[in-house]
């Protein structure tokens, strides 16, 4: 019995232990599971936040990419429109082309213009790429996070370099050859596939392919001679930068010749444009002065013609007032309601344009005759052609303020002769407002009463303004038929009336001739002209030295930078142009924004001189474009040359050390940039050629004078020796006789 109780207790104890153990294990499992779930939940929160941050970054990157592409597209569109306008200004009309044969050729020429515009836009982008990058990087580093510079970024600058590289290759190797051969093509005559235009496209594509194959074979021969490991005929080893490297090297060689020659050519161009015009202006001024000097000799004839004493010559202020009044009153026009023909109402309308040099009108000419019809002391004039007079009402004689019957007006202290042009413009505006009024043409009162009332009103207004100290050029808008009286309008109302270009006729010039003649004969006008002439003469004499000094400073700075870069390369202070994948901080200029601007100015100057020298070379001089007379094949050739030079310009400028900006994209991976000998030789030749061309240009006139003096000296010695020989021969003849 005890044995059974012991066994039951042991079994119960074992069962209890197993239950407790299983419960403990289950509790441990539940605890472990709960703890693990909490840990997983904590870990799950962190990936969601990081995932959200990644999505935000990707969204920003996408928006930046879209904005970058939009900016690149707009820049290309602007450059394309400018290039298209430039080509349209240069090219000859399609109907005048030698190869133009009909409407089919019109489409061909349109396509060629589009392709040439694309290539020219790429060239302009390549030229402006380096200055834009230098200034852009400097602005980004100076004003980091600026609101107005959010559109500008390092990725945008790098994308522009990549796009220029791709478009340059596509335009140079695909588009321009196809455009040239497309104009020259006539179509395969034996093929029956497609129409004539399709056949011309096929022919142009075939010839372009053959042309590219010939170029590859020639390049292969050159590489074989140079023992270059890469072969162009091996398609797997040829990449686009290698092909572009050869083209850029050709462009760099052209720049090596044209830029130093352009340095010297800029001085001769400045001399041609400035010195020649200066001499012409001085001669014209001297002729005017001689005319002014000869005027007092004919004073008696002038008095006879004008019936005015020189002592009574009006002041310039009175002349200006007379201008405003004569133009408003006597310079009127009447319109024939039946024919719509505008005709003048004064005697000066019948003057011929040949009489403008005389500066006098018909009424003044008539005053020169005596009662018996004889001509007095007046100078002879040209014979006037008889013209049919208009059948209109009798003309009204011109009344001038300086006539003896009219009382003299006092001077206005506020008058300024330098505002003569403004006074004249105001008078024209007032006359235009009168002539455009409908009431002015129909139902107008008699002319005599209108002129008298108008002159009295204007004289009273001038007197009131002179007493109150107002400017005589204050506007007066006259409406003579509004409520039967005159009224004055504000200056804003008068200035709002536009000047009708149709009113500027030959009759107006005839009306103004006597007035302008009197203005030019006044002492105040002559004094002002003399003062202005001295200033103009001073400017004419200083503009060429200033321009030559500016060119000399820019050229000297460029050559000093190239020489310094050569010495740095030789002594190891500067490495060769290396591949730069990203824009780094060391691209910032050491002198800040001012240094970047100076560097950009030098780059632009080198760019201009390179193209001036390029089109001044004897070989390329014949390809120089002419406005509205350049054939389309010549435009395509010019586009190709400009594209080659423009693509090599950033590489050449960086090679000679005119910029510290690293070449981006595939431009810095060119093969010849890694050769130390080539880079040093390029810098040395650039300096030597520049100095040689400048020395030749600046000392050419002196050398010509020295050679001329030597030739004259030799000729004089020869003449003396010949004379001595002749004398000896004559003496021998006398002795023999």
Swiss-Prot record:
Residues 280-416 are annotated as: Disordered. It comes from the Eukaryota. It holds the Pfam family LMBR1. Residues 280-293 have a biased composition (Acidic residues). GO terms for biological process: signal transduction. InterPro entries: LIMR, LMBR1-like_membr_prot. One of its GO terms (molecular function) is transmembrane signaling receptor activity. Residues 303-318 have a biased composition (Basic and acidic residues). GO terms for cellular component: plasma membrane. Belongs to the LIMR family. This is LIMR family protein R05D3.2. It comes from Caenorhabditis elegans.
């Amino acid at each position: 019995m005890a044995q059974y109780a012991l066994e039951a207790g042991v079994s119960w104890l074992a069962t209890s232990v197993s239950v407790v153990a299983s419960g403990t294990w289950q509790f441990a499992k539940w605890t472990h599971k709960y703890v693990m779930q909490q840990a997983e939940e904590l870990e799950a929160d962190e990936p969601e936040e990081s995932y959200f941050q990644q999505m935000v970054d990707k969204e920003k990157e996408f928006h930046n990419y879209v904005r970058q592409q939009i900016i690149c597209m707009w820049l290309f569109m602007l450059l394309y429109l400018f290039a298209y306008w430039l080509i349209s200004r240069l090219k000859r009309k399609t109907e005048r082309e030698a190869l133009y044969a009909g409407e089919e050729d019109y489409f061909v020429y349109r396509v060629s213009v589009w392709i040439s515009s694309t290539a020219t836009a790429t060239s302009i982008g390549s030229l402006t790429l380096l200055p834009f990058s230098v200034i852009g990087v400097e602005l980004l580093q100076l004003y980091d996070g600026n609101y107005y510079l959010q559109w500008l970024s390092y990725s945008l600058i790098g994308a522009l370099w990549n796009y220029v590289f791709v478009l340059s290759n596509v335009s140079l190797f695909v588009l321009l050859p196809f455009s040239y051969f497309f104009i020259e093509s006539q179509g395969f005559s034996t093929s029956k596939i497609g129409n004539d235009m399709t056949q011309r496209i096929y022919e142009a594509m075939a010839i372009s392919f053959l042309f590219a194959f010939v170029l590859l074979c020639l390049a292969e021969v050159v590489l074989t001679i140079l023992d270059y490991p890469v072969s162009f005929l091996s398609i797997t080893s040829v990449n686009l930068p290698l092909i572009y490297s050869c083209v850029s090297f050709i462009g760099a060689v052209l720049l090596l010749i044209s830029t130093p020659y352009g340095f010297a050519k800029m001085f001769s161009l400045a001399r041609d444009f400035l010195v020649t015009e200066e001499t012409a202006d001085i001669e014209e001024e001297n002729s005017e002065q001689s005319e002014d000097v000869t005027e007092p000799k004919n004073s008696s004839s002038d008095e006879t013609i004008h019936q005015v004493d020189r002592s009574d010559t009006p002041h310039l202020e009175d002349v200006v007032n007379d201008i405003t009044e004569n133009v408003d009153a006597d310079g009127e026009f009447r319109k024939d309601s039946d024919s719509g023909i505008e005709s003048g109402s004064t005697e000066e309308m019948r003057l011929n344009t040949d009489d403008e040099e005389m500066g006098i009108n018909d009424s003044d000419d008539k005053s020169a005759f005596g009662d018996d019809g004889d001509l007095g002391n007046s100078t002879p004039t040209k014979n006037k052609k008889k013209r049919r007079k208009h059948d209109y009402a009798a003309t009204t004689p011109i009344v001038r303020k300086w006539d003896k019957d009219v009382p003299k007006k006092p001077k206005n202290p506020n008058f300024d002769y330098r505002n003569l042009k403004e006074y004249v413009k105001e008078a024209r505006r007032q006359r235009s407002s009168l002539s455009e009024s409908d009431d002015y043409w129909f139902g107008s009162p008699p002319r005599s009463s209108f002129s008298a009332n108008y002159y009295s009103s204007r004289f009273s207004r001038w007197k009131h303004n002179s007493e109150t100290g107002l400017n005589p050029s204050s506007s007066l808008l006259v409406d003579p038929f509004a409520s039967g009286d005159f009224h004055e309008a504000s200056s804003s109302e008068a200035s709002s009336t536009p000047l009708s270009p149709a009113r500027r006729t030959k009759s107006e010039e005839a009306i103004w001739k006597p007035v302008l003649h009197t203005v030019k004969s006044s002492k105040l006008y002559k004094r002002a002209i003399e003062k202005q002439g001295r200033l103009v003469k001073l400017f004419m004499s200083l503009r060429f030295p200033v321009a030559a000094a500016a060119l000399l400073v820019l050229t000297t700075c460029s050559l000093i930078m190239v020489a310094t870069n050569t010495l740095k390369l030789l002594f190891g202070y500067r490495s060769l142009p290396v591949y730069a994948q990203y824009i780094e901080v060391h691209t910032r200029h050491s002198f800040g924004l001012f240094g970047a601007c100076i560097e950009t100015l030098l780059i632009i100057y080198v760019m201009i001189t390179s193209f001036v020298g390029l089109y001044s070379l004897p070989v390329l001089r014949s390809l120089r474009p002419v406005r509205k007379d350049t054939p389309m094949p010549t435009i395509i050739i010019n586009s190709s040359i400009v594209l080659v030079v423009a693509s090599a310009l950033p590489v050449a400028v960086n090679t000679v050390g005119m910029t510290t900006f690293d070449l981006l994209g595939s431009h810095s991976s060119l093969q010849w940039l890694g050769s130390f000998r080539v880079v040093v030789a390029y810098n040395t030749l650039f300096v030597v050629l520049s100095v040689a061309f400048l020395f030749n240009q600046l000392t050419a006139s002196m050398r010509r004078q020295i050679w001329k003096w030597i030739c004259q000296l030799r000729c004089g010695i020869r003449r003396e020796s010949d004379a001595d020989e002749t004398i000896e021969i004559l003496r021998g003849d006398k002795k023999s006789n």
